[in-house]
């Protein structure tokens, strides 16, 4: 009976948390490490020349799993990143938050779409340097183009 209680407690313990992380080179000599825990907060650290340059975090308000991808989202040759998750409603849209690396600030800066509140189902048009997403106006899906 003791072993059963220990196994049951170990499985259902509220103190278990899952952390996931990704590391990437932002540009030559600059690295970023991004960690997300329990779908509530994304923490990041930027390092250069073997020292920490910046640390920060972003709160995320979702009940769904958080995903992080890195890539060049403003087409400047430096790696940026996005946080994305499925919407909390019917779960049919992906919500993206876009963070661009600013060499001037030596930090990531969140950008917003040109229309609507969020980047929904984000796509990139590298040729035209556009971020393409959806937004809703009067309950109708519209195409939003954000130039970067």
Where are these regions (language model features)?
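Beta-propeller blade repeat segments, especially FG-GAP/WD-type strand-to-loop junctions
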Residues: 47-49, 92-113, 147-148
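Acidic, small-residue rich beta-repeat scaffolds with periodic aromatic anchors
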Residues: 3-12, 16-38, 121-148
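Acidic/hydrophobic-patterned starts of short beta strands in beta-sheet-rich repeat architectures
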Residues: 75-86, 129-132
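Terminal domain-start segments
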Residues: 17-71
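Residue-level detector of short, conserved catalytic/binding motifs and their immediate flanks
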Residues: 66, 79, 96-97
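A mature extracytoplasmic/lumenal domain signature
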Residues: 85-87, 114-115
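Beta-propeller blade termini
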Residues: 64-73, 117-132
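Short, solvent-exposed loop/turn segments at conserved positions within beta-propeller repeat blades
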Residues: 90-94, 140-143
């Amino acid at each position: 009976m003791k072993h059963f209680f220990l196994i049951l407690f170990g499985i259902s313990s509220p103190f278990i948390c899952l952390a996931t992380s990704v590391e990437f080179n932002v540009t030559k000599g600059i690295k970023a490490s991004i960690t997300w825990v329990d779908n509530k907060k994304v923490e990041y650290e930027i390092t250069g020349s073997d020292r920490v340059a910046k640390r920060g975090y972003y709160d995320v308000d979702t009940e769904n799993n958080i995903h992080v991808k890195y890539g060049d989202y403003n087409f400047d040759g430096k790696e940026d990143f996005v946080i994305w998750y499925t919407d909390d409603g019917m779960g049919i849209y992906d919500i993206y938050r876009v963070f661009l690396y600013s060499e001037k600030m030596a930090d990531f800066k969140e950008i917003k779409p040109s229309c609507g509140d969020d980047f929904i189902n984000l796509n990139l048009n590298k040729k035209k340097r556009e971020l393409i997403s959806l937004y809703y106006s009067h309950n109708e899906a519209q195409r939003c183009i954000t130039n970067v």
